[in-house]
Swiss-Prot record:
It comes from Mycobacterium tuberculosis (strain ATCC 25618 / H37Rv). Pathway: Carbohydrate degradation; glycolysis; pyruvate from D-glyceraldehyde 3-phosphate: step 4/5. NCBIfam families: eno. This is Enolase. Homotetramer (expression in M.tuberculosis H37Ra). Homodimer and homooctomer (expression in M.smegmatis); homooctomers were active while homodimers were not. Transmembrane segments: none annotated. The modification Aspartate methyl ester is found at residues 72, 90, 123, 203, 210, 370, 375. GO terms for biological process: glycolytic process. Optimum pH is 7.5 (expression in M.tuberculosis H37Ra).
Length: 429
């Protein structure tokens, strides 16, 4: 049996230069695995709590308390447990913390152990992680939702929408989808230069020009797709992450592109975009607690576009269940650090699929070289992954892992392509 023998932890840096937690787990059979925990810039209020140190060190963002929690409490609690019983291990972590938001020991400390245990168990079983988690039928390669133009909390510009993504839905394979996305990315750089706009990068590797607004950004990306010799809509679709909580103020409304708007007015704005651009997905179009607005928006345009819940659901089965009951969104963004254990993440995915919701696996803006989410995307058959631009090694690491998985699967590999969005046709395709 793959019994946990040793647990170690340390403080490392993420892609934004902020500290995060790395955990190592060793089993009695000699197997060893390591996991690093990501961190978000625009975080949902209802996410699992990251344990940070406060004080002057690293501007208060140190994670020595979380590391110590692993060494002093979490590690001793899981040593001796069977690593291939992930649910047992994760339940032990949840029980040990004893809070609904993992605020005592820290979601970052707990997640590091959860993921490292899963990796060690997979290695002990001599299985790739995607096969260990997903079983023998895991074979779907996801559409890469590439964030090639950054705004909002991911860039120091006046662009309110946080992410403008390209989705190579017409590619025949993941390797070709990655090539198409990379070529559009480079074409966008040329388009921006011709317009005299900045080609500096945001947190997730996308360009961060200070353009006039949403439609200006979408026009630039559409030009880049055509410049790369591809067809907007048929070959490469568009997607947005509005991260609307970031421009919502209680008592005021949505302060968006210089105008204060209601939820209904935001819905009208998005509806207008659908007729003009080949959009297949909009994430967080409204604020995280605007349940009524979300329900009305979903009823209005949910049959025309994928509506992804991130901050409103925070990968939490309880919040997702409420969303399903209220008709809120039609897809779930999956971020393992929002809920804090692999088991709870998989429970949320199962609930989403049973409720008829699509799932999109996602990175965070503060990433590491850890490639676990690439394996997770294939394991659950999500058909979609969001892990930044095809630039910066912490983003590219995930794409390269998916290339390896596609190669390992051989003839069994299937690229999701436009089947990842079966209910939504690009209106301008």
């Amino acid at each position: 049996m793959p019994i946990i023998e040793q647990v170690r932890a340390r403080e490392i840096l993420d892609s934004r230069g902020n500290p995060t937690v790395e955990v190592e787990v060793a089993l009695i059979d000699g197997t060893f695995a390591r996991a690093a925990v990501p961190s978000g810039a625009s975080t949902g209020e209802h996410e699992a709590v990251e344990l940070r140190d406060g004080g002057d060190r690293y501007g208060g963002k140190g994670v020595q308390k979380a590391v110590q929690a692993v060494l002093d409490e979490i590690g001793p609690a899981v040593i001796g447990l069977n690593a291939d019983d992930q649910r047992l291990v994760d339940q032990a972590l949840v029980d040990l913390d004893g809070t609904p938001d993992k605020s005592r020991l820290g979601g970052n400390a707990i997640l590091g152990v959860s993921l490292a245990v899963a990796k060690a168990a997979a290695d002990s079983a001599e299985l790739p992680l995607f096969r260990y988690v997903g079983g023998p039928n895991a074979h779907i390669l996801p559409v890469p939702m590439m964030n090639i133009l950054n705004g909002g909390a991911h860039a120091d510009t006046a662009v309110d929408i946080q992410e403008f993504m390209v989705a190579p839905i017409g590619a025949p394979s993941f390797v070709e989808a990655l090539r198409w996305g990379a070529e559009v990315y480079h074409a966008l750089k040329s388009v921006l230069k011709k317009e005299g706009l900045s080609t500096g990068l945001g947190d997730e590797g996308g360009f961060a020009p200070d353009v006039a607004g949403t439609t200006a950004a979408l026009d630039l990306i559409s030009r880049a797709i055509e410049s790369a010799g591809l067809r907007p809509g048929a070959d490469v679709a568009l997607a947005l992450d509005a991260a609307a909580t970031e421009f919502f103020t209680d008592g005021t409304g949505y302060v968006f592109e210089g105008t204060t708007r209601t939820a209904d007015q935001m819905t009208e704005f998005y509806a207008g975009l659908l007729g003009a651009y080949p959009l297949v997905s909009i994430e967080d179009p409204l604020s995280e607690d605007d349940w009524d607005g979300w329900a009305a928006l979903t009823a209005s345009i949910g049959d025309r576009v994928q509506i992804v819940g991130d901050d409103i659901f925070v990968t939490n089965p309880e919040r997702l269940e409420e969303g399903i009951e209220r008709g809120v969104a039609n897809a779930l963004l999956v971020k393992v650090n929002q809920i804090g254990t692999l088991t709870e993440t998989l429970d949320a995915v199962t609930l989403a699929h049973h409720g008829g919701y699509r799932t999109m696996i996602s990175h965070r803006s503060g990433e590491t070289e850890d490639t676990m989410i690439a394996d997770l995307a294939v394991a659950i058959g999500s058909g979609q992954i969001k892990t930044g631009a095809p630039a910066r090694s912490e983003r590219v690491a995930k794409y390269n892992q998916l290339l390896r998985i596609e190669e390992a699967l051989g003839d069994a590999a299937r690229y999701a392509g436009d089947l990842a969005f079966p209910r939504f046709a690009c209106e301008t395709k």
